[in-house]
Structure formats: C-alpha cells, structure tokens
Amino acid sequence: MMYQTGVSSMKMDYRQICKNEEISLLIEKGNEILHELGYTEHSRKHAMKVAETAGKILKELGYGKRKIELAKIAGYMHDIGNSINRHDHAQSGAILAYQILKELDFSYRDILVVTTAIGHHDEGTGTAVDEVSA
C-alpha cells in the first residue's frame, strides 16, 4: 500500500478551509447547540481566533510554514465535534476532520497532525502530545 508522504505542499490552505461550506456548517451547528446549552460563543469567529493564535505561537517559536498552517487548520476545526455532542466533542471532531481532510486530498501525515491536535484539545480529557496539539 502506498501512502502520501506529506512532503509536498498542501493543496488547500487555512484560508480555503475557512471557506469550506461543510466545515462552516459544522462550526455553526455546534455554536447553536452550545448556545442552547448555555455555553459562550463558539462560532466561526471563535474558530478563527483559535487558529490565528495557534499560528502566531508556532511562528514565534520558529516553526516552519507547513507546521504553522496545520496548526491554524487544527485550531479552526477544533470544535466541529460540538455539532454532534459537547460530550467527547474532541474525539468526534477528530473523526469528522479525518474524513473531511481525506476528501479534500490532504496527505495522511497532515491529516494525522490535525486530527491528533483536535482529538487532544479538550481541557478535561486531552493533553499536549506534539507541538501542534500543545
């Protein structure tokens, strides 16, 4: 079986991910659900703030463009699992992200960087396992 190496440049970048209808709908549905549950705002605005902050931190620490881009994508997509349920949203979000990024033709290596960060982002159940998830 051949695997994509993830060495070549990504076909889609953070800005294109932000324009993706499926991802946007998942974020907004999650925001609606959380609003009904009494949580603070978790809209695309929140997602973009997390993404930009993640990118800024990795840039300040001297990471390369690819790693920064993946951190921004993970930050933007980190709460898509709320569209299913707040409970275990990090894990369901990682599964959703895997399928979406696979359909968008991301390399398996890049998919795993993003899904690992999403799956480990919940403050109650997650832990930093690499520079992107941190």
Label the predicted regions:
Residues 3-90, 102-103:
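Acidic/His-rich, divalent-metal-binding segments that scaffold phosphate/diphosphate chemistry
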Residues 85-95, 106, 127-128:
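Metal-dependent catalytic cores of enzymes that make or break cyclic nucleotides
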Residues 107-134:
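Histidine/acidic-rich helix-loop-helix segments that form or flank divalent-metal centers
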